[in-house]
């Protein structure tokens, strides 16, 4: 990127001043860039973002090793999503099996989401300290075992207990998977790869819906879907064993072996000291990301978890029709997340999220009012195109906002705390819909799932817009060379490659000058 441009004012200080500046930057096409020369002198300029690149050329930038890490991370996230949606799309079957209400069944979803933040903290910190490989392997194996335990839960109470424990281990997947996948991708390709990666969640839903369609609508058929989920999770864990640790941790171990004198303070104590320093420095960013993830998790769970139930009850579809509608809906999510994640590398992370959320609001009438399978499938496709389009930006956005040494725990914990806060979303939708009735197109009195989901989604989408507009953005931040947390803070070999990597700096060496560029380093 060129180091010349129109002079810009320095980054504002303070929460409100920074928010005001970030909001103003949203309406300027050029990016605010901080340029630091070899003497530590900084200037700020406006620069046009790099032109949008052909996605094929971006794919070509990834080496075979990069693709390996990315695909394993994608598969882990897909398996995690399959395990979660295996329950949400079979709410009606499970309610019949345990002879209880659909609202009571969604209590299991609430418990799963409540405990995911604890798992994210535990497995995220372990992954940041010891590496991405074995924490993810153990995590996936335990998820598979708990899927099997769900099948054999004899009572509703036992079912809830297993799903609560399931949530604890499910929480550890997201942070490790996206950190492993994106930290090994070239910077220019991260927007596109983020969009594809996030759609592992939607693809997991599609696979679960296909499995549900394949096993039929009988009550006991839900067990077959859980068996498939167990095999998928255990299989991904076994697959991860075949590949090495992330290169950052291999490099750190090599450097520690060659220069033990530089790592005398490394260890658990140094790791926790780094954690405390990070929290003191980044607590505002942490709170912002939790608020953002709360909105986003409400956004996805409200618009999708009860969608199959909506088709079955309000629209009176049969199991096959509802499954086909759900599959097409999440196919739209896969397409939208990939395209909008890719575009975010050019138009900006915040603009991509805001425009997607706004368009999804406009589509709500078309999403809930039609009565035929074709119409609802088409509107569901485009609704989730933009819902998950906004979501497609999240993996790279969270990684760029994260302290670089905590790229597994920070995104994982903030995402899962947002999940925890939004955990009652499906339960709220079901409770309101089951207690509110409307007359459908056949003049029959039915539960009002459509209006409930529509009103809630409008409120949530507007919340996303209001939260994102004044928020921070670090598009283009380079975090792949960050020092490993707990390594004593003396790894000069790595540290000298980046001046202040937590502010999103990248290194550009041109001629005799070494210039350090920071893109959109707005603070939370």
Placement of each model-derived feature along the sequence:
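Cytosolic juxtamembrane N-terminal segment immediately preceding the first transmembrane helix
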Residues: 2-89, 96
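Conserved MFS/SLC helix-loop-helix module at the cytosolic interface between two early adjacent transmembrane helices
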Residues: 118-156, 347
């Amino acid at each position: 990127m060129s180091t010349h441009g129109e002079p810009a004012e320095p980054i504002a200080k303070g929460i409100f001043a920074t928010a005001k500046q970030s909001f103003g930057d949203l309406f300027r096409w050029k990016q605010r860039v901080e340029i630091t020369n070899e003497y530590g002198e900084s200037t700020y300029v406006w620069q046009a973002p790099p032109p949008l690149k052909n996605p094929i050329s971006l794919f070509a930038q990834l080496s075979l090793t990069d693709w390996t890490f990315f695909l394993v991370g994608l598969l882990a996230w897909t398996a995690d999503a399959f395990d979660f949606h295996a329950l949400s799309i079979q709410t009606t079957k499970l309610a019949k099996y345990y002879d209880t209400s659909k609202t009571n069944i969604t209590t299991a979803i609430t418990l799963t989401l409540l405990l995911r933040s604890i798992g994210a903290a535990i497995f995220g910190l372990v992954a940041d300290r010891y590496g991405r490989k074995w924490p993810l392997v153990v995590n996936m194996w335990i998820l598979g075992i708990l899927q099997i335990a769900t099948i054999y839960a004899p009572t509703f109470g036992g079912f809830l207990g297993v799903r609560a424990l399931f949530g604890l281990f499910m929480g550890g997947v997201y942070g490790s998977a996206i950190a492993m996948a994106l930290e090994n991708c070239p910077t220019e390709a991260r927007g596109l790869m983020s969009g594809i990666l996030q759609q592992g969640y939607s693809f997991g839903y599609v696979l679960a819906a296909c499995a549900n369609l394949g096993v039929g609508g009988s009550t006991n058929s839900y067990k077959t879907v859980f068996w498939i989920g167990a095999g998928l999770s255990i299989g991904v864990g076994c697959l991860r064993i075949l590949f090495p640790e992330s290169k950052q941790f291999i490099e750190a171990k090599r450097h520690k072996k060659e220069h033990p004198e530089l790592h005398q303070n490394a260890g658990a104590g140094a790791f926790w000291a780094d954690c405390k320093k990070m929290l003191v420095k980044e607590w505002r960013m942490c709170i912002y990301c939790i608020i953002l993830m709360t909105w986003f998790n409400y956004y996805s769970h409200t618009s999708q978890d009860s969608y199959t139930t909506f088709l079955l009850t309000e629209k009176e579809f049969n199991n096959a029709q509802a499954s086909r509608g759900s599959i097409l809906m999440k196919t739209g999510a896969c397409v939208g997340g990939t395209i909008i994640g890719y575009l975010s590398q050019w138009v900006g992370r915040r603009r991509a999220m805001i425009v997607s959320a706004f368009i999804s609001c406009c589509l709500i009438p078309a999403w809930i009012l039609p009565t035929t399978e074709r119409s609802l499938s088409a509107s569901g496709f485009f609704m989730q195109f933009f819902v998950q389009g906004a979501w497609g930006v999240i993996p790279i956005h969270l990684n760029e906002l994260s302290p670089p040494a905590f790229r597994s725990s920070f995104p994982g914990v903030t995402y899962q705390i947002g999940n925890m806060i939004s955990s009652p979303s499906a339960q709220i939708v079901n409770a309101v819909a089951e207690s509110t009735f409307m007359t459908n197109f056949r003049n029959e009195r039915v539960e009002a799932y459509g209006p409930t989901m529509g009103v809630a989604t409008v409120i949530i989408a507007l919340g996303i817009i209001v939260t994102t507009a004044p928020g921070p953005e670090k598009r283009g931040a380079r975090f792949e060379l960050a020092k490993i947390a707990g390594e004593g803070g003396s790894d000069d070999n790595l540290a000298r490659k980046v001046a202040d990597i937590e502010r999103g700096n990248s290194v550009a060496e041109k001629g005799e000058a070494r210039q350090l560029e920071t893109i959109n380093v707005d603070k939370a």
